[in-house]
Amino acid sequence: MNHITLSGELGSGKSTVANYLISKMPFRIVSAGLLFRQLAAKHGMSAKEFNEFIENDPKYDHYVDDTMAELGRTDEKIIFDSRMAWHFVPSSFKIYLYVDVDTATERIFNDKGRVSESYTDKETARQEIIDRRKSELLRYQNFYHCNLDDYSNYDLIVDTSHATIDEVNTLVFNSFQAFNEGKEYTRIGLSPKSLIMEKNEPDDTGEKLIINKKDGRFIVEKGFSRVKKALENGKSLVAVDVVKC
């Protein structure tokens, strides 16, 4: 496979994973975020302002999308760091990185390298992350009739909220290798701390772990014992069989 598409939440670690992968394999990175930041700067806007500005004007999205699609038709080994690259480069290993909003806020607020996304306080950062996410979901739904939160779009979903950088990097790299070799791998890895269990759960040892994603929350439908065991053992990730979106 010559193409990897890397989508996910703001602050989920997409750039970190992409840089790790190119250190292990002869790929180069094409970043939609960089293209959009350049366009925003050209218009004298912040990333959030530019997202809102283009909600009803698809020409900027089409410019970036056409660039991705054209590169996706080549044999060059490319990692596409882009929310929608999985859609425009269908012949790819499609990765989605999730992170909860509180962890994303901490990461982005404390990352002084994000010149275009600097904030005076954490609450402002948190609200802008939420607003930007809503803006992007609306834009992609309106322009492409695509739901970024539909996990069936991806080959690998990883929750980076409570996993270490090394854990995430290793999991992504090993999963890509397994995918290329036609071997089985864990397709969905979520933090047990991100999973919500109702009171008086039944003892369901041996059940598949099935999650219902509703209003941005991961609610356990089956597999309570697996989640409890992962929490007791201090696991940063637990293998999930199904996420209903």
Task: Describe the residue ranges of each PLM region.
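Small-molecule kinase domains that catalyze NTP-dependent phosphoryl transfer to phosphate-bearing small molecules
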Residues: 117-168
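Short alpha-helix boundary/capping and kink motifs at helix termini
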Residues: 177-219
